[in-house]
Amino acid sequence: CSVVFANSLTGEVLISSETSSLDNEYFNIDLISARANYEPGSALKIFTIGSLIESDIVDENNSYLVEYEIEIIDGSCDDNYTGLKGCFRDFLKHEPLNLNVKEIIERSSNVGTIKIVNNSNIDDIEDFLKKFGFGSKTGVELSGESKGSFAEYNTCKTCLSSLSIGYSINTTQYQMVKGYSIIANGGKDIQLSLLRNLDQNLNQKRIISYDLSNRLKKLLINVVEGDNGTGKSLRMDGYVIGGKTGTSRTYLEGIGYSDKRFNTSFTGFIETNEGPIVGSVILWGAIGSPISEYVTGGSTAAPIFKNIVRNLVPDK
């Protein structure tokens, strides 16, 4: 498990903590928050959908018929299909639903997200992600920081779909904290730092408009406050919390994607008198949840995020 929390206005890192894995055969977590690449899963959806909101291609009220599964490659959802992966499904089976963009993010629907994004240009989405620092080092004072990577999208028929739901991209935990900080602080760039009493982030350049920042924050708050929100376990009286759960299959070197291990996360913000604090909790290779039969970001990482917030901001 690794945890990073930072002040989204100053960039000051408030918490950077890690615990060792019990299975060191596959996981070496020395400075994992800065070095380790992972596919963030649904925590990336706010950016991929946000790129279309910025371009006025969609807004929060656009509605879609959302089935349980969607085929990007013909026949790929058939039980006897053996070709390249081209079938995407929601986490739990459901009847077709009419959902708007706000509800799709609230429920973290993979199929809904793919339907929103699939008529867009993948290069435009990549450019939007790069504005937030994905694909570049954050510059935090930790040796060996990774810059992450993007897939070769022009060679991949399903990459637009997989990128929209947080696959086909490698990120670091610090990159996710930086990206969410830009959303939380009103849309300005941020330099994360382990140093105290920072003034380096004053007058930073604007990455997205204040209006877009506010709209994306409302969508993230609804993930916690909405009746069907995947982050509703984070609700606490007196706190304003927004964020996004993330669940992705763990990639094991030399083996491939695991069917039993998952990188589960919650990345989000808490409003405080000193500005929004942004945090990320990741469980690397999680195999179970203490509160649910399902291994998800909502059932593993979100409870840890909640306990940290209670101690970090106890005066709410």
Which residues are covered by each model-predicted region?
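Beta-lactam-recognizing serine transpeptidase/beta-lactamase-like catalytic domain environment
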Residues: C1-A36, G50-I287, G297, A301
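Short, gly/Ser/Thr-rich active-site loops of penicillin-recognizing serine hydrolases
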Residues: Q204, T296-K316
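Short hinge/gating elements
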Residues: P290-Y294
